[in-house]
Every structure is written in C-alpha cells, then in structure tokens.
Amino acid sequence: MESDFKAERLSEHFSSVYTVDNGILPHISKKVDGETELNNVDFKPELVYKHLRKLKEKTSSGPDHLPALLLKNLAGSLSEPLSLLFSKLFSMSALPDIWKLAIITPVYKKGSPSDASNYRPISLTCILSKLMESVIKDAMLSYLLEHKLINKKNNTGVYPSAPLVRSYSSALMIGLFH
C-alpha cells in the first residue's frame, strides 16, 4: 500500500508541473528556394544499421519492451525491414501508437526522499522511435549544413547534437506524426 501512495504522490507532483503542448509549431522563415526543400528522408538500410550498432546496450526499453541489446545484436537482420518500416511511416506521416507513449520513472535529485518535488521524471520511450528520429536528425543536419543554413562555428551547442537540430527534428516529428 505504501508504494501505491508514493506512486500517487509522484504522479500528482509530475502532473502539477507538466505543461501541455499547445500544438502550435514555431514559424520558421523560409531562407531557401522551393527546389531545395527537405521533403524526404532516405532511410537507407546502411544508415539504419549504423544507428542500430550505435545503441548503448544498457539503454532502458520503452513501452514496447524491446531491449537495445536485442536490436543491436540483430542489426544485420533488422536494418532492411526497419528501413522499409521507417520509410513507410514517414511517407504516411504516421507512428505506431505505442511509440507515442512513455514509461515515466522518478529519479531522485536531492533533499528529503519523502518530498515528491525532489524527484525528476525521466520518460522512457521506445528505442525504435528514437532510432527513427536519429536518422531524421542526421538528414536534417546534413541538409542545414549543405544549404548553409547553419555552420559548425555558429551552431548553438555541441556539434552535431546541437539544440537547434534537435528542436527542428522534434518539431518535425510532432508536426508529421501528431
């Protein structure tokens, strides 16, 4: 019963500090002509394989319970079917419902362990969703660099995982798959 009480307290606290997305995407001014738009992402099996092999084996799985170690070890067999799946999902602007879910895990920060505000929520999302987003992020980064919309020197954050590219890829995922 005590663990149920703790879970309820944490849930109440996390809900009280949660902000709801208004669904409005930020306006991004158009700085390139229509012929240079990023309309598609090529989910080549080699790219998917590379991203699968980069997975950290101890990465926690999300609601689909697919472990990173399994995906990494089966990269050779999974890269082609996942390439096809990602391409189809991207072209349809669709995501499996389970990829839109997360397991919320409370992580203790400091202070009294009995105070719910001393915990921060960590969202464990599906590894395949993060994998697809990672391929999209790389394509966006290449596009932005190629068209001189950003460069390595003035890009905010640490290249190549810059906040600008992460923000754009998140906005793209939300806009396409919401």
Question: What do these predicted ranges mean?
Answer:
Residues M1-N118, S123, I127, L131:
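Surface-exposed loop/turn segments and immediately adjacent short secondary-structure elements
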